């Protein structure tokens, strides 16, 4: 995924998961929404985000993608995947307690974000050899 915003969202989300992991009163859940023409559910991006969450949370150790007909277990991250309308893509993470809720949301408004990211990556990789991730591209911009 070549979205600059999503890459930054992933970094913010990782930090938030590490911080909020210390507060047992907050449960963690996530969801994604995409247009009704998208064939995969969950999306590759949602799968990547779920992996990041599990890698940085000591309380969540598995993802449940399907509909639940029971209470989620404490170690389960329930990640909902919705399809409908014309939504290019929205991914959200929620830390919820009895007292309050904190939500992090990234919404693609235009597919031009992917073109912008691809062009930035092409400029960045010029003269380099090897295999790189888009996260490495963004990492250099943040240094």
Please tell me what each predicted stretch does.
Residues 1-32:
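A contiguous active-site-proximal alpha/beta segment in oxidoreductase catalytic domains
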Residues 22-143:
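C-terminal substrate-binding/catalytic lobe of Rossmann-fold NAD(P)-dependent oxidoreductases
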């Amino acid at each position: 995924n070549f979205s600059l915003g999503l890459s930054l969202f992933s970094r913010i989300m990782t930090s938030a998961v590490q911080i909020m992991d210390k507060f047992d009163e907050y449960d963690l859940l996530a969801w994604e929404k995409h247009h009704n023409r998208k064939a995969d559910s969950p999306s590759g991006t949602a799968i990547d985000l779920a992996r990041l969450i599990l890698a940085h949370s000591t309380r969540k150790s598995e993802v449940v993608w399907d509909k639940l007909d029971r209470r989620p277990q404490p170690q389960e991250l329930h990640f909902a995947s919705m399809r409908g309308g014309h939504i290019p893509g929205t991914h959200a993470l929620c830390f919820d307690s009895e007292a309050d809720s904190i939500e992090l949301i990234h919404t693609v408004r235009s597919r031009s974000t992917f073109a912008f990211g691809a062009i930035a990556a092409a400029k960045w990789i010029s003269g380099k050899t090897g295999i790189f991730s888009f996260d490495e591209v963004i990492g250099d911009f943040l240094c």
